[in-house]
Amino acid sequence: MDFSGKNFTAQQLEQLYRGILLPRMIEEKMLLLLRQGRISKWFSGIGQEAISAGVTLALEKDEWIMPLHRNLGVFTNRGLPLHKLFKQWQGARDGYSKGRERSFHFGTREHYICGMISHLGPQMAIADGVALAYKLRKENKVAVAFTGEGGTSEGDFHEALNVAAVWGLPVIFVVENNGYGLSTPVQEQYKCESIVDRAKGYGMEGVQIDGNNILAVYDTIKGVKEYCIEQQKPYLVECMTFRMRGHEEASGIKYVPDELFTVWEQKDPLKTFEHWLLKENMLTTIDIESAKTEFKNYIDTEIEMAFASQQTIVPVTKDEIADVYATWGQADTKYTVNVIGDVDNITQSSLVVHEKRFVDAISEAIYQSMIVHDNLIVMGQDIAEYGGAFKVTEGLVNKFGKERVRNTPLCESAIVGTALGLSLEGYKSVIEMQFADFVTAGFTQIVNNLAKIHYRWGQNADVVIRMPTGAGVGAGPFHSQSNEAWFVHTPGLKVVYPSSAVEAKGLLIAAINDPNPVLFFEHKALYRSVSGQVPEEPYEIPIGKARCIEEGEDISIITYGAGVHWALEYAGKHTNTSFDILDLRTLSPLDYEAIAASVSRTGRVLVLHEDTLTGGIGAEIAAWIQEHCFTLLDAPVMRCASLDTPVPFNIELEKNFLAKARLDECIQRLLNY
């Protein structure tokens, strides 16, 4: 291994040696503790330490890194105390994630490390978002994302690199190519000669280096960082290396030929570097033994400290639930905003109001929020000059420019990941899904990254995803789905679904102000068919509060979205029945108090929604009412929903599919029970 030709000072060489030595010695200690039965599992990175150490030491301490589960050297070289790291690995309350995350999945804002999720690929787009924040603020920084050669097979790898290239983002993508994805060899993973060859396809530069040579890693990253900042472009670095242990200790290494171990043992990144330092008289044997003694004492002391203070976690359920969402209040916003609870009397208020369509109310909410929040970025396919598929964002790019109103490539997953990266740097994002149906392409980012990150390590995800949804417009099975129930079932997300123009504006402003991830559903059929009196100035309607549109005595219809208009239309034609119509407005969290109040007024409940019947939110509401309001009921809670089929294209088939076609039948059954 050639360590020559690098212009390093003695101090730098010692720092790099110590940077690779400490994680190796910690790993060896962990393997000993594993054999002793004092810890239960370990994911080893022995043989790959030069990459983590070299990359981290080449960066400034306030540049974000997105590491994986073998990058111990990232954490040690960022100065995380070992006793707290060990507590994290042991699932202790006073680790970095209160016992909620295993091993290296946690993050820490203090050290500019964003923890991974097990899916690997989604990690990379978060670096895009961080780099976009750097670019917008004109900061001379880079973001770094790690992945393995296995992770490059995921679509998220393609999406992250493509977005970084198209937008000119200063991201360094580091691929640790250790030859095996768990046990799958590279010849079963990809067919190109080298992963770095893919860089050309994205119009970016790339380089393949010896990942076991810490000087090569450090020197390369230093140079690449300079290039990324100066050129405002991404870079792909493929580091060739080898993992000397199994995927985790229980899985073993039988799948690796013995001769490979023989070859790579001669390339051990610590031993070869140590040998060169001694040979070149950069360090003495005494220096090396002194460093090892220092680290051994440090490791033993820190681990015993962690063991001595380890206590069994006593779960406090209310704390677990409370940490799912970030807390907030009006004090967190930059302006004093009206909070409107009673939209029925809005015309009698002191606010100046005008008649607006549903679509225009949403546009105004975004426009006013962008004025108030100069850190708000709007992203989506065709949303800039074209104004979006439904023209919601029309004109915004003329006012705020293309830096803040950004057309995206067709890559939903990467854009959601980018939004999370922006959130790490204090930005807000509004993403437009062209159709709610297309959100499936970003599902992992939403339900595993956005939804879980605050519970995991206290980082909020300040992201609103706008979801044009619903049928009734003859758009067929892939442009008409009602998929809100998918997200209601996911802790950590808020789900909002307005039915009127005044609520669309107020709820969207509230969603943008909220530091938590919000799925904001907008029924396409309401965009230009529904209008109402809407205040000119910004205002919020509280998330999590339902609205009783009509009070009645005979039957409660609990609904939302287009269902509100179906219910009102039906009630208007059947004046002999007294209807209590409750517009939920927010599906997560639900307003259980309002639901119970409606039940108490009538004793008969129909839950109406456009979503299909089985597994819809109506089942959840019905179950809650049966559990908590059973004595108030005069009949079973009934559901009226769309057919359990895909949404058909033909207009007559679509009418038959929709819940509205069965509304009269359901109401009559309930009244006659």
Segments predicted by a language model, with ranges:
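Conserved acidic/glycine
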Residues: 1-51, 245, 249-400, 625, ...
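Cofactor-binding active-site loop characterized by glycine-rich and histidine/acidic residues
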Residues: 25-28, 32-167, 185-191, 196, ...
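Glycine/charged-rich beta-loop-alpha catalytic/anionic-binding loops adjacent to active sites
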Residues: 32-38, 103-117, 141-146, 179, ...
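Active-site nucleophile and cofactor-binding loops and adjacent substrate-binding regions
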Residues: 41-48, 69-70, 106-124, 148, ...
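Alpha-helix C-terminal capping segments
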Residues: 53-61, 128-139, 161-169, 200-201, ...
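Short acidic, glycine/serine/threonine-rich loops at helix termini
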Residues: 76-80, 155-159, 183-188, 219, ...
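A glycine-rich helix N-cap at a beta->alpha junction
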Residues: 91-97, 165-175, 404-407, 450-467
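Glycine-rich ThDP/TPP pyrophosphate-binding loop and its adjacent helix/strand module
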Residues: 112-308, 488-603, 607-608
